[in-house]
C-alpha cells in the first residue's frame, strides 16, 4: 500500500475543518494530518494537536504561537507552531503536503489557498471567497501549476458529480443547458420582508438544516451565500451568470442539479452533512465511507421547489449583478458583505442594512479589471473603507 496522503487543514477549528478531521480519522491508512491552523481558537487548536499530532500548527501571531508552543511542549507534543500569513502559506505550499483543505472563512483564506494552488496541490476548496475575489487569477494559477481543484461546498460538489468529466471544454459542447443551484432559503424563507429589519443574530444563525459557523449562517439567511456560490460556480464550471439558476429547495436533500439539452436533469441527493462532499473530494475518483447515514427518501417524503424572492433577498440580486459586471466587483461585494455581517453580529446594524451597505459600496466604487493579486487586495481594502464610512455616517 502507498504511503498515507499528507493533509493540511486551513481553518481546522471551524465546522468544515472539524468535519474533515472526522472523515480523516476514519481512514488512518489513507491520510496523515500534516498541519492544522486555527487563528483565534487557541484552546480548540491545542486539543486538536493533542489528538491528531500534526507536524505543524499555525496561529495568528507570535504571542499566541509562544503560548501554544509552550503548552504543547508541556503536553509532550512535538508539533511546531508557526504564526501569521506566512505560516499559513508555508503549510499550504510545503513540499511534503499532498492535499490542502482550504476552509478559512472569508478573504483571510485567499493567500494561503492561492499558495496551495501555485504549489500544485490537490486543493479541496471550501473557501468560496478565494474564487469570488480573484477568479481569473485563481483559475490561471490552477492551469499554470497543474493543481487539482475539487469543490467542497455541497452545491458545487453536487454539480461536479453531475457534470461529464470533460465539462472544461465548455458547458455547451457537453450538452449542458443550465446549472440549477439549490438553496434552502434559510431561516427567513417564509418571513414577510417588512419583518426582516427586526431579526436578531441568534435568529439568523439558527439554520433549519445545516450546522455552520456564524458568518456563513448569516450569509445563508440573507442568501448572500448563494450569491457567492453563483459567482464561484461561474468560475469552477466556466459558466456565464445567466446559465446558473438559483432554486429554493427547503429540504436540502437535492444539493444541486444539471439540466441537459436533451431534457435530462441529473441531481445529487444526500443528507445535509458536509462529511459527504468532504469524503468525495478526499477520495476522488474513488469513494470512501464518510460516517453519514444513508438517505431515507420515504422519510423525506416530499421535495419542494420555489423561486427566490428578490425583495426578501436583495443580496442575491447584488451578487448576480457583481458576477455580470466582473473585474473587481465580486471582490468588493465580498469585502462589503464581510464588514456588514460583522457589524450585524455585533448588533451595530439591522439585518436589512447588510444589503444597504453592500449596495452603497458597489455604487461608490467602480469595478476595474484584475491584472494581478494586488488589484484584488486593493479593491478589497477600498470596499472595506467605504463600508466603514457607511457605518460612521450612520452612527454605527
Swiss-Prot record:
Domain of life: Bacteria
Family annotation (InterPro entries): DXP_reductoisomerase, DXP_reductoisomerase_C, DXP_reductoisomerase_N, DXPR_C, DXPR_C_sf, NAD(P)-bd_dom_sf
Enzyme Commission code(s) on record: 1.1.1.267
Biological processes, Gene Ontology terms: isopentenyl diphosphate biosynthetic process, methylerythritol 4-phosphate pathway involved in terpenoid biosynthetic process
Binding site for Mn(2+): 153, 155, 229
Enzyme class: oxidoreductase
Family indicated by similarity: Belongs to the DXR family.
UniProt function note: Catalyzes the NADPH-dependent rearrangement and reduction of 1-deoxy-D-xylulose-5-phosphate (DXP) to 2-C-methyl-D-erythritol 4-phosphate (MEP).
Name by which UniProt lists this protein: 1-deoxy-D-xylulose 5-phosphate reductoisomerase
Annotated organism of origin: Stutzerimonas stutzeri (strain A1501) (Pseudomonas stutzeri)
Taxonomic placement: Bacteria, Pseudomonadati, Pseudomonadota, Gammaproteobacteria, Pseudomonadales
